[in-house]
Amino acid sequence: MRDNSAKGITAGSESQQTTYDPTRTEAALTASTTFALRRYDLAGRALYDLDFSRLNPQTPTRDQTGQITFNPFGGFGLSGAAPQQWNEVKNKVPVEVAQDPSNPYRFAVLLVPRSVVYYEQLQRGLALPNQGSSSGSGQQNTTIGAYGLKVKNAEADTAKSNEKLQGDESKSSNGSSSTSTTTQRGGSSGDTKVKALQVAVKKKSGSQGNSGEQGTEQVELESNDLANAPIKRGEESGQSVQLKAADFGTTPSSSGSGGNSNPGSPTPWRPWLATEQIHKDLPKWSASILILYDAPYARNRTAIDRVDHLDPKVMTANYPPSWRTPKWNHHGLWDWKARDVLLQTTGFFNSRRHPEWFDQGQAVADNTQTGFDTDDTDNKKTRLSKGSWLRQAGPDRPPVWSVLRQHWQPHLVRASAFGVWDLFVLIN
């Protein structure tokens, strides 16, 4: 079993409280885990692995027109030094790769800190690989996730034949009835019952049918354990919708928070990194975009173009007004060019997909602004200009990774028939 407490994270079915120490966790994971990209050819043969922590890349040289110097046999012309930001991202985890359709050797890699990946695995109850062998004879290797998920070695399930569904008898009092259905897996006496569904209903007065049919009851749903909507409306205005951390329950708790003392009940989800924490130290805690050149059959096969860090504070402050609202120019008239940009940028940065980048699992979207500054008379599309579309937050650009997928996805879909899309596979 992993020693989670030594890494700054306390998780499992027995220890319920989580210790937040990103610095210690990041340092321990960097020394103990390795992530790499495995390169495949079009025939599906593994060629080599790109381990960023051990890679010593160089920056490619450019000609007078700004194009990368490349020879099919000699490879890329190298400048002799890696980008300045390379040391900031070489220990991060590659989670997604996209290929440039205009250049078969150019890739964009999305990198995130190791502790973020590790924390998300624990929070979502994903079992992690066992480290070493179990002590003692006959003892099973068991890995416990944050939600109590247990993974045992391969063995015959002798309790399968004893599995059955047990239900409590419904009880009625004062004109109300409630039913509860529970499931229990047979086996050892230490197994606990797992509640599958509990619905409380109440009778309406005069609900019995009087049309000669056998008495039928009309009941209305009063409460349902499976109908807890994650979106709650504000108290002051019925139109405002706000996502809160209390709406996302992913980890078990033994405390009686919220009036529920059940040790298996979910507790509010807590973010691993706050937005301000990421904003103050982008190189260490932010997600990063790495532009990578790789030619598998050349002598100088790997080169690094540039590294860009994503700032969630800037993204939430600038992107929603620009791609969710109608576009008007500085004269107050409808700008057809801006409308064209709006139609091209329909992607969005979802706080549920990457909740670790937001405070308390909450994203703010401002749909009242036009998205353009009044002093900006040009309103140029700068996202495809050299070095600016990844580094700066502009009023006419969606999130960076949405740009990559929006502009590259059609080409990648067509190229997938030739095996181009799956050239890289993340290995651990």
Swiss-Prot record:
Alphabetical list of Pfam families matching this protein:
P1_N
Q: What protein family does this chain belong to? A: Belongs to the adhesin P1 family.
Query: InterPro entries this protein is in?
Result: P1_N
In this chain, the stretch annotated as Disordered covers 1-25, 157-219, 247-271
Q: Where is the composition biased (Low complexity)?
A: 172-186
Bias-annotated ranges (Basic and acidic residues): 157-171
Q: What is this protein called?
A: Uncharacterized protein MPN_101
Question: Compositionally biased, Polar residues: which spans?
Answer: 12-22, 206-217
